[in-house]
Amino acid sequence: MSDINKPFLVVIVGPTASGKTELSIELAKQINGEIISGDSMQVYKQMDIGTAKVTNEEMDGIPHYMIDILNPDDSFSVYDFKLRAQALIEDITSRGKIPIIAGGTGLYIQSLIYDYPFDDETVSKEVEQKTQLQLQKLEPLTNQEVHDYLATFDPQSAKDIHPNNRKRVLRAIEYYLNTKKLISSRKKVQQFTENYDTLLIGIEMSRKTLYSRINKRVDIMLGHGLFNEVKNLVEQGYESTQSMQAIGYKELVPVVNGELSIDQAVETLKQHSRQYAKRQLTWFKNKLTVQWFNRETMSLQMMLDEITTQINKRSSKHDCKPQHPRSSTREL
């Protein structure tokens, strides 16, 4: 299928605290767009501050999707994201608007843009239930023990995935339990046919500036009540759920339990956030063809002008109606 026959899609990526939310909202105002979150954690209710979830005030009337759709103990896979996002893109496009994906979860973005062969991830409820029971047995194990288990049947994935990346390790195990196939083998035969006419935009800046923004964002989150958010989740019994392994939550659980000081936890949280941002940038630059905009050399308005110029050229073949801009209230 030629690009002219594919739905038009704008994707905004970048590391945490780079300004994706602000750019996506301002862009949506100018191009008659609606925003789909491409963040794996913003789907969860009650996890607002630690995921830097956009507020109703910041949305400023722009529709946002894939936010607050699950409870903290619900499971959510790349395949789930792809199905929901595809339906949303179809709906948004059918109404003459432009869908904008904004987020930092690289695998989610890649699975949506390209034709991932996910057919064999559709499993029966019986198999899925058995898989979940087996995964529950792994919960008490350490990261290294879970990683060692993965290595018994998929040594290549064990080699590719760090033991501390528990989420990816568990995803590889879950894939095997559901399909009896190795996720490492699937990647080798993966197709990369583009599903959409995609304008892929990335935000970058110097490491020094990015790390400063990350540290400031953590301080802002704490000032807005991140500790109480984590405490409330722990008190509701969500401590052992997969969602609570996210950065911003796992670091503060020991504080809630009286096992660590808040100062130590904050330093760890900032360090983990900086490390995650570095991994995000590496992933995007290795896996996707991104048009990068430097936030230090370009103002927000300069980025918007350049992006809208490109969109106007490409969207002339699509039924899209640009609008006039309004201002944003977004912090970091």
From Swiss-Prot:
UniProt keywords, alphabetically: ATP-binding, Magnesium, Nucleotide-binding, Transferase, tRNA processing
Family stated for the protein in its record: Belongs to the IPP transferase family.
Name of the protein: tRNA dimethylallyltransferase
Basic and acidic residues: compositionally biased ranges: 317-332
One Pfam family of this chain: IPPT
Region of interest (Disordered), residue spans: 313-332
Region feature (Interaction with substrate tRNA): 39-42
EC number: 2.5.1.75
Single GO biological process annotation from the record: tRNA modification
Single GO term (MF): ATP binding
Reactions catalysed: adenosine(37) in tRNA + dimethylallyl diphosphate = N(6)-dimethylallyladenosine(37) in tRNA + diphosphate
Broadest EC class assigned to this enzyme: transferase
